[in-house]
Amino acid sequence: MTVLLEVKNLTRIFGSLRAVNGVNFTIREGELVGLIGPNGAGKSTLYNLIAGAIRPTAGAIVLNGMEVTGWKPYNAAKAGVARTFQIPKPYRNLNVIDNVVVSALMHHRSVAEARAAAEGILVDFGLSDYLESPIGVLTVGLLKRLEVARAVALQPRLVLFDEIMAGLTPTEVRSMTGLVASLPGRGITVIWVEHVLYAIMNTVRRIMVMHRGQLIADDAPEKIAKDPTVIKAYFGEEMPVA
């Protein structure tokens, strides 16, 4: 597979805190990669660096062979990087379909084309009954689906998911993991931050682990579950994979 994203010695310092400290990894096109670690490990800061929300103190970010270190969020979106947030941030003055149309307009010339694309995505994501509904009627689970739909409507090459399982019921988690697992089939590469570990451990083939700003492990889920360094740092005991 072709390399899509390279992170090279990426560092971000806030005062005396090294929130991200010399992180290196490569993501290939079509990968579905988990990123785990406790609160404060540096995951959100890493996302902010990749998405252009903040500039690194040192290091480089390369997307599709082009260095994009320090780019602006709108440049990231145009280049095909999308992200979601743990707490969904829809446009509450717009209905469900128009929230997705806003994203779809990035790559469609007319509102009609964008609306058709948005409707197709919402149908695929189980939101066909809510196209014209106001945001206020959506449950947490449906809001999370909308958040993913908005990201997919940007036609991203890479999407950064941030705890999309938070607040979901076990049934909703199973359904959402199916949606996430389907995205590489749409040509979308995924990095997925998650604290609902059973969801991520049973869905991805590769997991990266951050601790105190550093990447301490990068391996298959079954190996991560038995890695003594990971167990000691986060879990205190061996993690079940199934």
List PLM regions with ranges.
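Glycine-rich phosphate-binding loops of nucleotide-dependent enzymes
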Residues: 2-242
